[in-house]
């Protein structure tokens, strides 16, 4: 480095001071900004406010709606699969002895899951989709809700049905998972448009 003589002209010394001090000021300002705005854990911030669409579909109708909703909300999509898939005979609601009829007659029925939807702790908002069976959610939805800790999560039911309403579905699901924050569910057609889904999500304040 260049050695600057002790004796400098006033002009030369002024130039030196102008060169040194601004950098000192900038460095000090940067330190102050660092104290004012502490470092944020970026990986943690990226996991905040994540949304999941988890759904059960016996015939494929709810699948179409769930995919559309995931697209609108930019959410991850996971299917709730039964360990034993439902056949057409299982879904015959006219038959009181069909598998679905027997399950829905028993509030304690919990059909086994065929897959594990892990990582629930990474999500803040979870849409839970299903077809309406006997004016409420299929029993496997209760199995799903009891399979993980949803404490503090925002849960939003959505359902498909040709004509049946949701009945007391919201209240029944809340009893199964009381520590979650539930928003009102909605029954929709499998062909509900993206515009309608966006409007609904906006109504929810999400």
Question: Which residue stretches match the model-derived regions?
Answer:
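Short, conserved loop/helix-junction motifs that constitute active-site signature segments
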Residues: 120, 146-152, 176-177
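N-terminal beta1-alpha1-beta2 submodule of the flavodoxin-like/Rossmannoid cofactor-binding fold
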Residues: 27, 38-125, 135-137, 142, ...
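Cationic, low-complexity basic patches in intrinsically disordered or flexible, solvent-exposed regions
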Residues: 13-18, 37
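Extreme N-terminal basic, low-complexity initiation segments
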Residues: 1-12
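Short, glycine-/small-residue-rich phosphate/pyrophosphate-handling segment
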Residues: 156-192
């Amino acid at each position: 480095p260049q050695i600057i003589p002790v004796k400098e002209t006033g002009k030369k010394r002024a130039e030196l001071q102008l060169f040194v001090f601004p950098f000192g000021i900038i460095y000090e300002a940067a330190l102050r900004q660092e104290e004012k705005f502490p470092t944020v854990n970026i990986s943690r911030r990226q996991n905040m406010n994540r949304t999941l669409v988890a759904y059960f579909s016996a015939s494929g109708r709810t699948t179409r709606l769930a995919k559309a909703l995931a697209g609108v909300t930019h959410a991850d999509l996971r299917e709730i699969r039964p360990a034993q898939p439902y056949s057409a005979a299982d879904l015959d609601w006219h038959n009181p002895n069909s598998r679905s009829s027997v399950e829905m007659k028993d509030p304690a029925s919990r059909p086994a899951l065929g897959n594990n939807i892990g990582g629930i702790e990474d999500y803040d908002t979870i849409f839970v989709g299903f077809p309406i069976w006997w004016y409420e959610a299929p029993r496997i939805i209760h199995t799903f809700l009891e399979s993980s800790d949803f404490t503090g999560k925002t849960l939003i039911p959505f359902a498909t049905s040709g004509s049946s309403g949701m009945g007391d579905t919201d209240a029944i699901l809340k009893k199964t998972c009381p520590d979650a924050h539930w928003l009102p569910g909605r029954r929709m057609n499998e062909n509900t448009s993206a515009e309608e889904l966006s409007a609904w999500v906006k109504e929810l304040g999400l």
